Structures are given as C-alpha cells and as structure tokens.
Amino acid sequence: PGSTFKMVTAIAGLEEGIISGDTYVTCTGTYEYGGQTFRCNNHDTPMTLNVTDALKYSCNTFFYTVGQKLTGEHLEQWTKKFGLGTATGQAAGPTYREQQRKADPAIREWQGGDDLNAAIGQSDNGFTPLQLANYVSAIVNGGTLYKPTLVKSIKSYDYSSFMKTDESEVRGKIDISDATRELVMQGMSEVTDEGGTAGSVFADYPIKVGGKTGTAEMFENGESFDNGLFIAFAPFDNPQIVICVVGEGAGHGAYVAPIVRDMLDEYFSIGKSDSAASRQAENTLIRKNNCK
C-alpha cells in the first residue's frame, strides 16, 4: 500500500499515546536506526512536522519515529482492526501475509528495521485495493467497518419491484477518539491542498476532496518497480464515496490521482450538462423480448 497505510500508523500512535497533535519531529531526509540509514525523499528541505503535516507531505521520518516506538505487534493489531489483510467477503487475490515469517523458515526473523518499513506501508504489508478503500471508509464514517457489497439493488424491468437488495453488513466498530479522527482527517484534507502530495491535481477542484498518495515498492522476478496508489473521499465535510486506484509501475501516487479526479467528475456529474447529469444509469433487469 505504500504511504496510503500511514493513516493506520498515525491512528495507532495517537490512540496508544505515543504521539499527540503537538508532537513534532524534524526530518533531515534520513533516519538512522540499528546501523542502517532509512530515507525520506518526500520533501526537498529539512522540516519540522506534526502528524497532520506528516500526512500532507507524506514524511517517512515522522512515521519511522512512530513505528520504532509503536513496534510491529501493536501496529499489526491496529491493522487487523481496520480489516486490512482479512477477507472482505468480496475481494479476490492475496490478503495480509499473516505469520508468513513463522510459516516459512527460509524467511529471516523480523528485525527492528522492519517496524520502520511497516509503518510507512512497505515490508510485508500486502493489501487489496478494496481493503484499502474499506479501511479509509471506516476512518471517514467515524469507525464503522462494513462488509462491501458489489450490487446494492436490482429493479425489475418495469421498475415495479426490487428483484435483489443487499443491505450493508457491519463487520465491526473501531474505537477511535474524535480528537484522533480530526487530526487524521485534517492531514488527508491537506494532501489535496497547495503543497500537499496531490495538491496540484485538486487545486481548482469544485468539491473539497480528502486523500492520500502512496508509492508501493515492488520486487518481482528479479526486478524492482513502484506501484502508484491514491485513495480519495468526497465531499470532505459529508463523504459519499471512497475511491482507491492502483497503477502498476506508475511510480508516485500523484501520477494516478488524475484518474481518481476523473472518476469523481463522473460520480458528481462535474462538467456535464444538466440533461446529461439527469440520465443516471440504474441496475435494471431487461426483458428478454427486448434483446436483439
């Protein structure tokens, strides 16, 4: 997930009392730990940041600091609370590689440096786009984790009845303080403001959008590459929709943010005429004798 995971680290750090809104960390571009140098390449000059700043600029050093103090065990607990790495009931594909190191003796033991990488969404973190969208949805709605549904309802061909209706199922409630949620939401708001990692994409957008960019470091078949991710929700003050886009090999998440903007244009009928906006597609069954 890359840096789209940083909201989990922020929430865990705030709720566990490791940081507060008044905790500031100075980033010089590098972080020394255990004889290793961990880098932050997300801003050009040294900065002193709090948690909202760290989300806005996607500062690795801030989250390295939180990850070192938090430890992987506590971070994994919060990861599970948000449903990351657990089956959604709809998604196909890999889930969180729980206990992978213990199951495979060929994999080295977890090291302290892995806590740092996990805190910024690297290391063994591996989640589906649906899991990521669902976890951000739980943040913006106040802590309710839902089981995703693919189809809300299907109407009969003459609109007289519903042939199928799926009600949202609550998977769990996540206890997050209002203060923690407000700090994280503010950070996601500033991501799309001027100077934020997606600020240039949403600078003139008519609806306020919250979001988070991410760059997931991948290594497959002897080659390394970066996936770009962007998660967004809108409108900021009354969220209706959460979108997660992954661009394989796209690099930085800002490079896929325009795709999310296009999807929001479509959802909110931005830039369309009133007549076009009124023609909303519905899940309607078609009578067999209408098919040619």
For each of these PLM feature ranges, what is it?
Residues 161, 165-171, 261-292:
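Short, gly/Ser/Thr-rich active-site loops of penicillin-recognizing serine hydrolases
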Residues 246-250:
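Ligand-site clamp/hinge motif
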